[in-house]
Amino acid sequence: MEHTTTFSIGNEGREVFWNAQHFEPILFTLTAVALAIFAYGLYRRWKLWKAMGKEEIRWDKLPARIKSLFVNGFLQVKTWKDAYPGIMHGLIFFGFFVLLFGAIFDAGEFHITEPLFNWSFLRGNFYLGFAFLMQFFGLCVLIGILLALFRRYVLNPERLGYKGKPDNTADDAIALLLILGIIVTGFLISALRIHVTYQQAPWEWVRFVSWGIAAYALAGVETSTALALHKVIWWTHTFIALGFIAYIPYSRLLHMITT
């Protein structure tokens, strides 16, 4: 799919598959595989729940159920009883929620509104605000994950255990490290792109975390080296993100969907 939009001051934006144009078909294939694994995992869980569960009318008390879904599912009120875990969980949950919708926005423009309606909405001031929010909430998730790792593996409060046994399972570490990997590689991908294209796209300072990495950590890196590193980290980010999706139904991460 060809996208030849020219960006400039007043028409700010970014090229979605920058430095990775030829990877698009492979990415779609791998995404289909990850989604198939995800769907199969959900199907297995559903069969297990159906075999173990009791018949129950789920449409009774609908207003109360909707309220509970909003209060406990979206607002995560139960996690705010204690400050540390409440803040930690809020940073991760709400940050990831915004990043998910950001990815949907990106994909919606690239695959639907641009090719079908010739409409690009991630442009100008809207793009600048969008890019800033993606960096801000990405940073929120990063802080939340670091707080979670510190709490679980340094503080390790007793209530994280079960019946006197520690609850630091490999599943917990995998889940936290996958999310950490997605965020860190996402920042690095943007930083490498900014390092190469900052003269053509000076507005990318709104991606303040990646801009800082590009300005300081990548200062002096040759363009050819940055391009090569970008491809490596782009693929690393892709495999981690798709692995995360595929892993959800087989781990405790499933509670993001079921609670």
Which residue stretches match the model-derived regions?
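Membrane-embedded alpha-helical bundles of multi-pass integral membrane proteins
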Residues: 2-259
